[in-house]
């Protein structure tokens, strides 16, 4: 196995995307813009209701950190993804898709069980609401992870969705220890307002004594710090991380590195589907930092890539699109 720049740990999920009405979300008690966990029976029931009454848009490999890793690799970075899938059709499809995107995986990720699924419900305002059955990924342990690539990586990336799993949190703890012992920087994302609201203790455990780079959106930042303004939230987040990146949807992003803080405006697009936008942002930002492009260029690239994800259905762009976007940003920032 060759060395990689990015070692990511996250859930492995197959997305089923639907266009839905606001009334459908209300009727099924789904809070718009958040992720809700479900068991297999509830997932199957919702899927049948969706197929019967809403508009099906297709299936795609998902998982927050996986989407981030795909963006990182598609831009030219080398990456490894640690996850857990079932020994079923969806599991093999999932790992094959990562390998096709140039991402290294291990057969240790495959075990008996059912691969997780996520119903991605896109409302008329393009916001995504997720109903997730984690399946076997809820039982991710260090036994499914080959930590060797982490010892020589430059970045460890951890998704906040893992906060709901005790075994996954233990695996993250081990990954953090290996990263620190080998001088690997740690990036973390809060992932979702629901994680902040319902799994705060798990997030705190994984962030532990701090990280090098923290990603969150505006709502997550305010909720996690229990503040009313971004300025106040940023002051508290600086206690946890050197780099802070707060995304603000169409308004762009706020970037902080020690004493330097600046904002980069968003890109105007016709929003279709917000699913995966934050993930793509993180992947592009990490790639740019990793190759030494600087914070402002990293933010410009991340905003451009994520804006293109928002302008289409599905959490990932075609691999061929990333190189063109990188070229555009480098030309603009020259």
Where is each model-derived feature located?
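Conserved phosphate-binding/catalytic region of the ribokinase-like
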Residues: 1-13, 19, 27-37, 53, ...
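Substrate-binding N-lobe of the ribokinase-like
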Residues: 42-117, 134, 328-332
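Hydrophobic beta-strand scaffold residues
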Residues: 79, 105, 186-187, 244
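Short gly/ser/thr-rich secondary-structure transition/capping motifs
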Residues: 100-102, 135-142, 193-198, 226-227
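Conserved phosphate-binding/catalytic loop of the ribokinase/pfkB sugar-kinase fold
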Residues: 108-110, 120-166
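Short beta-strand scaffold segments in enzyme catalytic cores
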Residues: 117-121, 252-255
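A short, aliphatic-rich alpha-helical micro-motif
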Residues: 149-151, 207-208, 238
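Conserved beta-alpha-beta core of the PfkB/ribokinase-like small-molecule kinase fold
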Residues: 155-232, 251-253
